[in-house]
Amino acid sequence: MTNMVRWLFSTNHKDIGTLYFIFGAIAGVMGTCFSVLIRMELARPGDQILGGNHQLYNVLITAHAFLMIFFMVMPAMIGGFGNWFVPILIGAPDMAFPRLNNISFWLLPPSLLLLLSSALVEVGSGTGWTVYPPLSGITSHSGGAVDLAIFSLHLSGISSILGSINFITTIFNMRGPGMTMHRLPLFVWSVLVTAFLLLLSLPVLAGAITMLLTDRNFNTTFFDPAGGGDPILYQHLFWFFGHPEVYILILPGFGIISHIVSTFSRKPVFGYLGMVYAMISIGVLGFLVWAHHMFTVGLDVDTRAYFTAATMIIAVPTGIKIFSWIATMWGGSIQYKTPMLFAVGFIFLFTIGGLTGIVLANSGLDIALHDTYYVVAHFHYVLSMGAVFALFAGFYYWVGKIFGRTYPETLGQIHFWITFFGVNLTFFPMHFLGLSGMPRRIPDYPDAYAGWNALSSFGSYISVVGIRRFFVVVAITSSSGKNQKCAESPWAVEQNPTTLEWLVQSPPAFHTFGELPAVKETKS
């Protein structure tokens, strides 16, 4: 009973962070299964495993996106690493609102349940993650499936809003003595910026999907031209949330990568203030570029010119971050342990994804590339190899602190190389498919596209083998087997620890600090 009470009613940031990790892992496995089903269907031309059920294909696409974004990356990055390490890094005893933290987590399992049940109602929700009307309207999806998906998004959104309020309050009000804003570790800064993005963008999504809900069930016509509405309004509202959302997914990853690159290069981060202002700039600019997802809907030419220019400007702070990471490594005494491998992989692959993003920012080019596999390749390079690589990097970096045991280094490196090879083989050929005009969200294709699709599907099978390696590592590390106890500071940063998590025991005590740590100075 006491164990159940500990986990159900927990107000401890580390316990809640662990729950987020477990939840993210479960959702991630499900999302990966869906992606493999998608790649099996696309492995060769003609109807394959889905037997011609094209609605089911779109349900898989939709569920894959929702699972990976709202139930894997966000819970693991912000809920998992954020909850676990933000209080420790700022020298706080816990989060500002511990019980709010608990409900933030426990809103997610019901939300996941609603999403999964939507697949079992009538023909499921085959709208794509954007849920565009009129396809998501009552005439095209007549059952309750889309309504269930909308409620799922509502719950997940409330969870994220409450969590972000908690993080903002914690970071502003609960820093330890001497921990000024300009001494905050970069991961804490990244979570702070992310929390503001969530707080400002999610209410807009909530408004859009609530309007869609009333369109479907109460005969309003917000998005129905027959009653004076406009489906393009939905797209504006959705993408005003949707674009900040992609930065929400990647910003905490930026913070994690900064810590890792600094630790394994044995140097402080190059240009700390520049890194902070770059993240803030990315956050602000992220709200000013949403219509680059809509270049093909008939926007005015000067509107498209503005959104093209604004989108390209985001590349500037992003470039500052990438060059600062490279400058941190420059002249450093680099150790290629597993976290550093994932961090270097992140920098390389995220840069490729960023370059294809610059290509897509051109409204003229995007007319040709919109809704082709070029776009799929672009955002999977920044998510599947950006956000997910950052998650893996953070896991290997902090797993000793979380479990109190060291991970098997060789298995970790094997995991990296299999995954690196697999994801590249999956997504690089998609650039060629997109340039040849293969459209997204379509389960069949002409024979001309067969070669690259077969290669892509093969790559996804390799990625699954890599993920299986990862769970082997988790199992070995979490069990009290041969692997030895983890030191307070496994990466030997005792000489000059720059962050507080390496000064507490591994794993940290239930109440991390006996007395609040005072930060005297930061050595440069």
Swiss-Prot record:
Residues that coordinate or bind Mg(2+): H370, D371
Catalytic activity: 4 Fe(II)-[cytochrome c] + O2 + 8 H(+)(in) = 4 Fe(III)-[cytochrome c] + 2 H2O + 4 H(+)(out)
Cofactor: heme; Cu cation
Origin: domain of life: Eukaryota
Binding site for Fe(II)-heme a: H64, H380
EC number assigned by the record: 7.1.1.9
Cofactor note: Binds 2 heme A groups non-covalently per subunit.
Annotated positions binding O2: Y247
SUPFAM superfamilies reported in the protein's UniProt record: Cytochrome c oxidase subunit I-like (SSF81442)
Name of the protein this chain belongs to: Cytochrome c oxidase subunit 1
Cell compartments where the protein resides: Mitochondrion inner membrane
MF terms in GO: cytochrome-c oxidase activity; heme binding; metal ion binding
Chain residues that bind heme a3: H378
